[in-house]
Regions:
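Cys-nucleophile CN-hydrolase/nitrilase-fold catalytic domain and related Cys-dependent amidase chemistry
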Residues: 19, 27-101, 106-107
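Active-site-proximal beta-strand elements of phosphoester/diester hydrolases
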Residues: 4-14, 18, 95, 107-108
Length: 108
């Protein structure tokens, strides 16, 4: 990364509560914008929408969403930020993430 931070903000229609369809959609979008940016920012809960069925849709930190995001970050050499429905034990919540191309992971 140089002296200028190039950011891509992505906002799209989602397929309600369909992680796989939304991950596929974002993968296609990423293939067109990477190389021209340093940071990609996804919307809140981009894989499911802001669903109230959190128990059914939540996943662990090493689940499908973060696994895909880490792969994209590494393959496209871009940092990626967003959030997803996370599970920690019996608790579910909206967890923010920031994944760097070197594999560094940051959560809040």
């Amino acid at each position: 990364m140089g002296d200028v931070l190039r950011v891509s903000l992505i906002q799209t229609d989602i397929v309600w509560e369909d992680k796989r369809a939304n991950l596929d959609k974002y993968a296609a979008i990423l293939s067109h914008i990477t190389g021209d940016c340093d940071l990609v920012v996804f919307p809140e809960m981009f894989t499911t929408g802001f669903s109230m069925r959190v128990e059914d849709l939540a996943e662990c930190i090493d689940g499908e969403t973060i696994t895909e995001v880490k792969k994209w970050s590494r393959n496209y050499n871009v940092a990626i930020a967003g959030s997803f429905i996370a599970r920690a034990g019996n608790v579910c919540f909206n967890r923010g993430f920031f994944i760097e191309p070197d594999g560094s992971e940051h959560y809040y």
